[in-house]
Amino acid sequence: MAQNKNLNLELSLSQYVEDDPWVLKKKLSDSDLYYSAQLYLPKQEMEHFVLPEMDHDLVRKLGAGVEVKVRDVDSVDDFYTVRLKVRNGQYYLGKGWGLIKNAKVLNTGDHIGLFWDKLTREVKFKHFKSQSITMHREAGTTSTQKNVLQKK
């Protein structure tokens, strides 16, 4: 019988480190909710944590915009089809974002979290309401993100 030395079969529900999958965190501003039908996403976090997890073909089409499914983790049956696009180096959710902000009754100052689930090929969404989410001052990164960024 062969010996098993240091075999680690630990499974994770997320491809992200630690227990904080919310790699895109944002405190909503008036411009996210009232002045445009777009939610601009943090560029550094998109490029370090989201794009590497997406299919290459999907990333290649971001300039023209791609439809992605956004699923609310607090209500698994709630999902929305939203256009994810990049323009002038800025990533944003466009068409469909208005449905989410209205359905979830999002307000200025509310915090939201997002991440790309590569298994289901969809964006996971969480509304933290007006709760503060732990963020570092440098580039608005979470502790999980900061550790990964420092390793690069």
Swiss-Prot record:
Coiled coil: none annotated. Keywords: DNA-binding, Nucleus, Transcription, Transcription regulation. SUPFAM superfamilies: DNA-binding pseudobarrel domain. Transmembrane segments: none annotated. GO terms for cellular component: nucleus. InterPro entries: B3_DNA-bd, B3_domain, DNA-bd_pseudobarrel_sf. It comes from the Eukaryota. The keyword Glycoprotein does not apply. Its main location: nucleus. Residues 24-131 bind DNA. GO terms for molecular function: DNA binding. This is B3 domain-containing protein At1g10455. It comes from Arabidopsis thaliana. The lineage of its organism: Eukaryota, Viridiplantae, Streptophyta, Embryophyta, Tracheophyta.
